[in-house]
């Protein structure tokens, strides 16, 4: 492992090796950023698919572009809200660890 490059990971690894088990704080420190990354990845993929479908629908029916764009923007806001909620949970967990 290349832990020498990242002192934060090295200190976490040393703590785990000394205890032989992982504490809840360590598990949260390792899993919270991963969860936010997954939320952002899912949000990005979903948003890209929604915009792609909306642009395709506008290409087929240009006269309905107003309704399509309105619906797409509402859907995009809901998709982004889920990522923002994940980020808020991350900061709450980070606060609990400190």
Curated annotation (Swiss-Prot):
Q: Does the keyword RNA-binding apply?
A: no
Q: How does it sit in the membrane?
A: Multi-pass membrane protein
Task: Say what the protein does.
Answer: F(1)F(0) ATP synthase produces ATP from ADP in the presence of a proton or sodium gradient. F-type ATPases consist of two structural domains, F(1) containing the extramembraneous catalytic core and F(0) containing the membrane proton channel, linked together by a central stalk and a peripheral stalk. During catalysis, ATP synthesis in the catalytic domain of F(1) is coupled via a rotary mechanism of the central stalk subunits to proton translocation.
Q: Which residue windows are transmembrane per the record?
A: 27-47, 73-93
Q: Which family does it belong to?
A: Belongs to the ATPase C chain family.
Where does this one sit in the cell?
A: Cell inner membrane
Q: Which GO terms describe its molecular function?
A: lipid binding; proton-transporting ATP synthase activity, rotational mechanism
| Site (Reversibly protonated during proton transport): residue numbering on this chain | 80
Q: What is this protein called?
A: ATP synthase subunit c
A Pfam family the protein falls into: ATP-synt_C
NCBIfam families given for it?
ATP_synt_c
- Keywords recorded for this protein, A-Z: ATP synthesis, Cell inner membrane, Cell membrane, CF(0), Hydrogen ion transport, Ion transport, Lipid-binding, Membrane, Transmembrane, Transmembrane helix, Transport
Specify whether Membrane is a keyword of the entry. yes
Q: Assembly and interactions?
A: F-type ATPases have 2 components, F(1) - the catalytic core - and F(0) - the membrane proton channel. F(1) has five subunits: alpha(3), beta(3), gamma(1), delta(1), epsilon(1). F(0) has three main subunits: a(1), b(2) and c(10-14). The alpha and beta chains form an alternating ring which encloses part of the gamma chain. F(1) is attached to F(0) by a central stalk formed by the gamma and epsilon chains, while a peripheral stalk is formed by the delta and b chains.
Cellular component GO terms, alphabetical: plasma membrane; proton-transporting ATP synthase complex; proton-transporting two-sector ATPase complex, proton-transporting domain
């Amino acid at each position: 492992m290349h832990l020498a490059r990242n002192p934060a990971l090295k200190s976490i690894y040393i703590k785990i090796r000394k205890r032989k088990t992982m504490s809840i704080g360590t598990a949260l420190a390792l899993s919270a950023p991963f969860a936010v990354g997954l939320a952002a990845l899912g949000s990005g993929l979903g948003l890209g698919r929604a915009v792609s479908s909306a642009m395709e629908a506008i290409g087929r029916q240009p006269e309905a572009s107003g309704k399509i764009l309105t619906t797409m923007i509402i859907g995009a806001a809901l998709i982004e809200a889920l990522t923002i909620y994940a980020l808020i949970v991350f900061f709450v967990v980070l606060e609990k660890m400190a």
